[in-house]
Amino acid sequence: MAKLTKRAQMLREKVDTSKVYNLEDAVALLSEVSTVKFKESVEVSINLGVDPRKSDQVVRGATVMPNGTGKDARVAVFAQGAAADAAKEAGADVVGMEDLAEEVKKGNLDFDVVVAAPDAMRVVGQLGQILGPRGLMPNPKVGTVTPDVATAVKNAKAGQVRFRTDKNGIIHAAIGKVDFDASAIKGNLDALVGDLKRLKPSTSKGVYFKKITLSTTMGPGLTVDHSAYV
């Protein structure tokens, strides 16, 4: 049998994968077992009682994390005229139209979120094969195609997280950093759960929140008591 590394041995001793943790204990344990040299993100996986094979049960949207995510998002905006001015004033990192599209085509994608005014979609639509696979394509369902580009920029800068059920009906989202305290993580999780409740498909039957797991970028997954959300 291969010898366990010190980290693997430590995780085996401290983490009980069969246990359901309360949120405070889970956050404390994730911080305790984080041994990497960077501040790991705290990520949540929420198993929903939906059938993602049915188009009317795909859950997607965006949540502004009230306590931020610990990451300063870079925002690119496709807009012109007054909308472009509003985007710049709101703090957008890059604003443009055809010129910005040319940069994207060259592979210059130094941003985390893309916002577009409706009249800019004629330009953005040509970039689907580049932006789509990277999860950057603007979409009105998550508020990134909007005439109010300033608010979209402010939301992205404030820590807005976009989500969509994967093929197994699971939502994945970053809800903070490992140095966040439990109350900050809980506040962000509460906001996300609130939006998921609001977006529950009418055709979804039975238990909606089936399981919630917290993990860090490089750490173990801990099952969290989610009875308060049922």
Swiss-Prot record:
Part of the 50S ribosomal subunit. One of its GO terms (molecular function) is structural constituent of ribosome. PANTHER family: 54S RIBOSOMAL PROTEIN L1, MITOCHONDRIAL, LARGE RIBOSOMAL SUBUNIT PROTEIN UL1M. One of its GO terms (cellular component) is cytosolic large ribosomal subunit. InterPro entries: Ribosom_uL1_bac-type, Ribosomal_uL1, Ribosomal_uL1-like, Ribosomal_uL1/biogenesis, Ribosomal_uL1_3-a/b-sand, Ribosomal_uL1_CS. Keywords: Repressor, Ribonucleoprotein, Ribosomal protein, RNA-binding, rRNA-binding, Translation regulation, tRNA-binding. It holds the Pfam family Ribosomal_L1. The keyword Lipid metabolism does not apply. This is Large ribosomal subunit protein uL1. One of its GO terms (biological process) is translation. Binds directly to 23S rRNA. The L1 stalk is quite mobile in the ribosome, and is involved in E site tRNA release. Belongs to the universal ribosomal protein uL1 family. The keyword Cell membrane does not apply.
